[in-house]
Amino acid sequence: MQSPYPMTQVSNVDDGSLLKESKSKSKVAAKSEAPRPHACPICHRAFHRLEHQTRHMRIHTGEKPHACDFPGCVKRFSRSDELTRHRRIHTNSHPRGKRGRKKKVVGSPINSASSSATSIPDLNTANFSPPLPQQHLSPLIPIAIAPKENSSRSSTRKGRKTKFEIGESGGNDPYMVSSPKTMAKIPVSVKPPPSLALNNMNYQTSSASTALSSLSNSHSGSRLKLNALSSLQMMTPIASSAPRTVFIDGPEQKQLQQQQNSLSPRYSNTVILPRPRSLTDFQGLNNANPNNNGSLRAQTQSSVQLKRPSSVLSLNDLLVGQRNTNESDSDFTTGGEDEEDGLKDPSNSSIDNLEQDYLQEQSRKKSKTSTPTTMLSRSTSGTNLHTLGYVMNQNHLHFSSSSPDFQKELNNRLLNVQQQQQEQHTLLQSQNTSNQSQNQNQNQMMASSSSLSTTPLLLSPRVNMINTAISTQQTPISQSDSQVQELETLPPIRSLPLPFPHMD
């Protein structure tokens, strides 16, 4: 067969293309070889034309002389071609950003029957497990999956979307959906009775797993339905297997527990805890007759006698804590009332409180005038125990109940400190006496040796000076010991760790 194009024409076309390519290459070579007189003073880049250099200089200077004249647009450009390209955004009817997107085409409405036939044929043809007995299906509500209808916009997407409708139809059975297009029924437990909750849970999980396995065998169009079913299964409430804590002492709770144990003895997961003891005797109240109310009250009062709480500001609790704990233990064992703890009859408490308030006011008024001014100074560090006891008695008259205990404790501590200081003082005295005796022995030895060697008239003055120095050294030691004894009779009060009561 002859070719439709003659050979001469093909050769002419090839020659023309070769000529054009050679010409373009020659032009490029000529441009590259041509001199570039216009050079950038900043980056030293050379250009063939001056306008190219000026356009390049705007990169370094940041000048943008070309502004967009569209109302509301404030963009500026350094090159004119960039401005013309920008103007197309305002003038173009089809925006550039939406060129790659697919346009929405509203097609002809598709029949709902065809869409349902194409979308959910797998649920009708799927092999489900055999039907359950009625006693197992009674606490369960089936969910029908029907296609979404009556929507003009999403008519093309009916093959992919489904609607979950929970038993809403005009049928007689409230648990079943009377619709010609019911495709599958997936049981979902909605608070069944407690006796059948655990029995139904096993079947529910098995039925859901069989339904999901049958759906997984369908084609790829039912993938969306599988996702919806899995999310629905996650939303279904399943009876929790965690043990419940229930206090069962009343008759109603006992009856409910017996019924539950009789119905499901294997799956009873309630943990019976002992009820906490109450402070009142409710058993005696329930069993008592209405005639002997007075005797019942007397019994409850005698059996439920509680200790009256003592005051927070009581001085016995602040100063002597151990005695209060011992007395509180004895109160609980014997059941009596101790007046030292501040537990008194409520009838006499008002009178006692008034008397205590009056005594406190009088003691405060007296303490302002009778307290010695030397209490505030440091000169009282050398006072004896009698003055210290007098000052403490004057300052703390309103603490009449706790003052003897406090004074005893203070006296004991001061006596202990004084005994320690006396022992130290005796040790110092014994050391001083031993030193003095040694010095005297040395002096006697020196005197005897000097008397043997020389006569008294020829005694050197140095020996006399040594003896006088030793005697003078012994006298100030004795004087200093007497001063130390006078100063160390009593220690300063502030140095003792005494728990003084806080003044209001």
UniProtKB/Swiss-Prot annotation:
GO cellular component terms attached to this protein's record: cytoplasm; nuclear envelope lumen; nucleus
MF annotations from Gene Ontology: DNA-binding transcription repressor activity, RNA polymerase II-specific; RNA polymerase II cis-regulatory region sequence-specific DNA binding; sequence-specific DNA binding; zinc ion binding
Ranges of Basic residues composition bias in the record: 85-105
Pfam families recorded: zf-C2H2
Keyword annotations: Carbohydrate metabolism, DNA-binding, Metal-binding, Nucleus, Phosphoprotein, Repeat, Repressor, Transcription, Transcription regulation, Zinc, Zinc-finger
InterPro entries in alphabetical order: creA/MIG_C2H2-ZnF, Znf_C2H2_sf, Znf_C2H2_type
Region (Disordered): 1-36, 81-178, 279-383, 418-453, 473-504
SMART domains: ZnF_C2H2
Gene Ontology terms describing biological process: negative regulation of transcription by RNA polymerase II; positive regulation of filamentous growth of a population of unicellular organisms in response to starvation; positive regulation of transcription by RNA polymerase II
Modified residues (Phosphoserine): S278, S302, S310, S311, S314, S377
PROSITE patterns named in the record: ZINC_FINGER_C2H2_1, ZINC_FINGER_C2H2_2
Biased composition (Polar residues): 1-14, 294-305, 322-333, 473-486
Known function: Involved in glucose repression of the SUC, GAL and MAL genes as well as of the CAT8 gene. Binds to two sites in the upstream region of SUC2.
Misc. remarks from the entry: Present with 830 molecules/cell in log phase SD medium.
Family that this chain belongs to: Belongs to the creA/MIG C2H2-type zinc-finger protein family.
The protein, known as: Regulatory protein MIG1
Protein's organism: Saccharomyces cerevisiae (strain ATCC 204508 / S288c)
Gene name of this polypeptide: MIG1
